[in-house]
Amino acid sequence: MSFFRCIGRSALFMLDPEHAHRLAIVGLKSGLNGCQKVVDKRLSVTIAGLKFKNFIGLAAGFDKNAEVVDEIFRLGFGFTEIGTVTPKPQIGNPKPRLFRLKEDEAIINRMGFNNDGHQVVDDRLRICKKAGVVGVNIGANKDTVDKIDDYTVGIAHFYDVADYFTVNISSPNTPGLRDLQARDSLHLLLNAISKARKEQEKKHGFSIPIFLKIAPDLSEKELDDIAEEIKLSDFDGLIVSNTTLSRQGLNNSHFSNEEGGLSGRPLFERSTIVLAKMRQKLGKEIAIIGVGGVKDAQTALEKVKAGADLIQLYSGMVYEGPNLVITILKEILQMMQQDGVDNIKDYRDHNLEHWAKFPL
């Protein structure tokens, strides 16, 4: 058992979750975790025209305001995603809004896109060294009537500083946001964003990849609709998935009835099933980033085997500590050596049929 699990986690878990998160940000700024790297070309992946040093990224939500972009790469991540960022700053939902379900190694949040807004985050990004790929996760303000417009504004604002965009329409904590996943609304959204990208591409002379982040709480028909719209659009891929509203499989936790999106270990199965189904529906060429319940080398590799090109994690680091990524990468390399695998991408789709067969 790691030092973090023995000592550090107990100390941090005595604090309110938001206070602990703030302390983690401050600690990273102070360089308390040193610098850790696992550099091996067998872990590198190229998708959507971007080369990732390794296949593990930090999911949006940890570094909402681009405060520790450079520091994140010292933890071993191959890429990071800041945000979700909205055009105007907003404070989010009332506190308490973040809850640890320790028995389940899970988190429930109803943060509500609390962030510093486009301009402040943009200013911070422009002074980063960017030791790896940095994505910008964009969203809509709670009080915005035309939410699609907020996304096109985000594309324009960050176009010359982002390595890729994530269009987040799947958070359960902004009223009406998930409605944009419905086919008619999604069609309008994807067209508007594609138009915004083309305008910026003409202006700047290069194209930035765009991913759509979807919820796990979707029916087979809804997944079919999303897949068809993605194939009709010029989007580069999907991120599967955001947090879930389901509480299936939880222990009788004190906080299990709190409203908000659930992440962590209980999300792994559902998100991996949705991932595999979307890989089947989209085919081999469209990129997919798998996220949800990754906590060790086994769960990380299973995402790839279910169809992911890259993976992201966040909640796993809360429970396993800042050395998690390094540990996963080292163990994955050992697995590759044992299996005679030349590159992590060679594992992709190995268990696709297994995961895709499960009902939603």
UniProtKB/Swiss-Prot annotation:
Listed InterPro entries: Aldolase_TIM, DHO_dehydrogenase, Dihydroorotate_DH_2, Dihydroorotate_DH_cat, Dihydroorotate_DH_CS
GO terms, biological process: 'de novo' pyrimidine nucleobase biosynthetic process; 'de novo' UMP biosynthetic process
Alphabetized UniProt keyword annotations: Cell membrane, Flavoprotein, FMN, Membrane, Oxidoreductase, Pyrimidine biosynthesis
Ligand binding (FMN): 60-64, 84, 137, 168, 213, 241, 264, 293, 314-315
GO CC aspect terms: cytoplasm; plasma membrane
Assigned EC number: 1.3.5.2
Pathway: Pyrimidine metabolism; UMP biosynthesis via de novo pathway; orotate from (S)-dihydroorotate (quinone route): step 1/1
Annotated active site: 171 (nucleophile)
Function: Catalyzes the conversion of dihydroorotate to orotate with quinone as electron acceptor.
Designated name of the protein: Dihydroorotate dehydrogenase (quinone)
